[in-house]
Each structure stands twice: as structure tokens, then as C-alpha cells.
Amino acid sequence: MSWIAPEITRVHPQFAELVGDERSLADAWLDFHRQTLLWKCGGLTAEQLKLRQVAPSNLSLLGLVRHMAEVERDWFRTRFAGERVGYLYCTDDDLTAEFDVETADAESDLATYAREIELVRRTTAGRSLDETFTDPRREVEMSLRWVYSVMIQEYARHNGHADLLRERVDGAVGH
């Protein structure tokens, strides 16, 4: 029997966090978007996750998972925390390699994504949204709040792509 992406249950902040401090709401919305991407992958085979269904784009559901693992690592661990961790899939010569999924191992890539999320949670635990850092690429001061905001919009945008990709794979729709 071939591997199938696990199905997950999402916790929608609209129903779980109606009142809360800014950090709790930011964490809830970021986690919701993380869960949404995995939810869109749930129940699909590795081959289905690799399908590129919206020509001429090279986007696939697995490519989006790999991309978001790279983005999480880059913004939270490399830029914010200053960790010296390399790319997961990309190289300095190919900054979009995460979308090259022909020979990718979907099960391993989803596990890598989950590990990266856990490492990011540890990195940001107890840190103030007001905490600032100098972005090494742009050489400008940024806050953790800004990183949360950009990550929520990044997921929202790519989850829209995931909606279309999933519908093209098997007709499943939903938000």
C-alpha cells in the first residue's frame, strides 16, 4: 500500500480565539494557515501531491509544503533568530528548487515541514512581538510582529493556490 498524506482537523481561530491578546491571536491565525495547507494535502498520495495542475505554473501541493518549510525557516530561524541553518531544498544558485518535486519524497517532506514548524515554535516561544532584529539581507530593522504578519499573508496567498490545486486533483473544495 502506498503512502497517503494524513488527514488533519483544523482549529479555526474564528471559533477558538474570539478574545485574546495580540500574540495569542497571531499564533492562532498562523497555526490555522499552517493547518490549512496540510488539510489541503490530506488523503492524497505522493503522486497526487506532486501534480502540477494549473498550467503554466510549476506549483504543486508538495511544492507549496516545501516552499513554506523554507519560508518558515528563513524568516523565523535565519533572519529573526540569527541561526546559521542552510536551505532545506534551495541553493544559492536555485532559490526556487523547492518546487522541483519530481524526485521528492512526499512523506519525508511533510515530516520535514512538521519538524520545521516545531523548531519555529520553540524559536518564538516567549518572545515579544515587539522584539526587533536587523534583517541580514535588507539591512533594515524589523520586528517579530512584522514577521508574523508577512507569514500569515504568505500562507493566505499560497492556501488560495492550494485550493485550486486540490480542486484540480480530485474535485475537493472548501476553505
Language-model-detected regions and their locations in the chain:
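Short, contiguous alpha-helical
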Residues: M1-A16, R23-D94, D135-H175
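A short alpha-helix capping/helix-coil boundary motif
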Residues: F15-L18, F99
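Active-site rim elements
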Residues: D21-A26, A104-E107
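Acidic/histidine-rich alpha-helical segments that form the ligand environment
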Residues: T96-T132, R145-M151
